[in-house]
Amino acid sequence: MKLSIFFVLFFIAIAYCQPEFLDDEEDEVEETLPVAEEGREKSCITWRNSCMHNDKGCCFPWSCVCWSQTVSRNSSGKEKKCQCRLW
């Protein structure tokens, strides 16, 4: 549901933009986007210990899912793992 609302708002924003504005923005984005995305991917694709302090928005538009798992087969200790997921 959140994803569909995002796309609707995204397309509305594009529909109201001036073509000259989009051309200028595309040039700027092409220069900075690969570096920003590469840095974000490296920091976001990691296991987390909690979903708090997700200030980089790594999981958007997905959600952060956490669960507990045992450390090893013969151990009763558990550790918390978190990951960004679509479901």
UniProtKB/Swiss-Prot annotation:
Places the protein is found: Secreted
Signal sequence coordinates: 1-17
Disulfide-bonded cysteines: 44-59, 51-64, 58-84, 66-82
Record keyword Secreted present: yes
TM region positions: none
Tissue expression notes: Expressed by the venom gland.
Main location: secreted
GO MF terms held by the record: calcium channel regulator activity; toxin activity
GO annotation, cellular component aspect: extracellular region
Keywords: Calcium channel impairing toxin, Disulfide bond, Ion channel impairing toxin, Knottin, Neurotoxin, Secreted, Signal, Toxin, Voltage-gated calcium channel impairing toxin
Residues making up the propeptide: 18-40
Described purpose of this protein according to its UniProt entry: Modulates Cav2.1/CACNA1A voltage-gated calcium channels (P/Q-type currents) in rat cerebellar Purkinje cells and hippocampal CA1-CA3 neurons. At saturating concentrations (>10 nM) decelerates activation kinetics and slightly increases peak amplitude without affecting deactivation kinetics. In vivo, does not cause death when intravenously injected into mice. In rat models, through its activity on Cav2.1/CACNA1A, has an ameliorative effect on memory defects provoked by hyperstimulation of N-methyl-D-aspartate receptors (NMDARs) in the hippocampus.
Extra remark: According to the nomenclature proposed by King and colleagues (2008), 'Gsp(267)' comes from the species name 'Geolycosa sp (strain A267TDLS2-KZARNA)'. This species has been reclassified since that study, as indicated in the work of Oparin and colleagues (2016).
Free-text domain note: The presence of a 'disulfide through disulfide knot' structurally defines this protein as a knottin.
Family membership noted in the UniProt record: Belongs to the neurotoxin omega-lctx family.
Record protein name field: Omega-lycotoxin-Am1c
Organism classification: Eukaryota, Metazoa, Ecdysozoa, Arthropoda, Chelicerata
